From Swiss-Prot:
Protein name from the UniProt record: Large ribosomal subunit protein bL17
Keyword vocabulary terms for this entry: Ribonucleoprotein, Ribosomal protein
Family membership: Belongs to the bacterial ribosomal protein bL17 family.
Organism, as annotated: Verminephrobacter eiseniae (strain EF01-2)
Protein's gene: rplQ
PANTHER family per the UniProt record, alphabetical: LARGE RIBOSOMAL SUBUNIT PROTEIN BL17M (PTHR14413:SF16), RIBOSOMAL PROTEIN L17 (PTHR14413)
């Protein structure tokens, strides 16, 4: 008996779904914030959070596991050299999903997925606040 497993099919074949989530993971690691539909954002959160947890311990085996999922060397390097050390003390909850209303063409619910306490943003906000004073 199948029973429910909490997987969103997103109206795609399994290979298309895996490739889409892989591309979205690479984009989120590279840009640290992406805009997508709400169901895709919720599914992305399920796959990116374990990747960041994996990056908190830098080892060859963990890098190979990450590369097996991401398939992009630059993303793996940033994940282990920047994001892993940045989130080392955070026990989980590395992403934030902000609802952005509805898309004009098809009224699909849109969302902004971003990394919590993004490494580049905190220093820029502090610098701009001190520059204004």
């Amino acid at each position: 008996m199948r029973h429910g497993h909490g997987l969103r099919k997103l109206n795609r074949s399994s290979s298309h779904r895996l490739a889409m989530l892989q591309n979205m993971m690479n984009s989120l690691i590279e840009h640290e914030v992406i805009k997508t539909t709400l169901p895709k954002a919720k599914e992305l959160r399920r796959v990116i959070e374990p990747m960041i947890t994996l990056a908190k311990q830098d080892s060859v085996a963990n890098r190979r596991l990450a590369f097996n999922r991401l398939r992009e060397r630059a993303s793996v390097t940033k994940l282990f050299n920047v994001l892993g050390p940045h989130f080392r003390l955070r026990p989980g909850g590395y992403t934030r999903i902000l609802k952005m209303g509805f898309r004009v063409g098809d009224n699909a619910p849109m969302a902004l997925v971003e990394l919590v306490d993004r490494p580049g943003v905190a220093t820029e906000e502090n610098n701009s606040a001190s520059a204004e004073q």
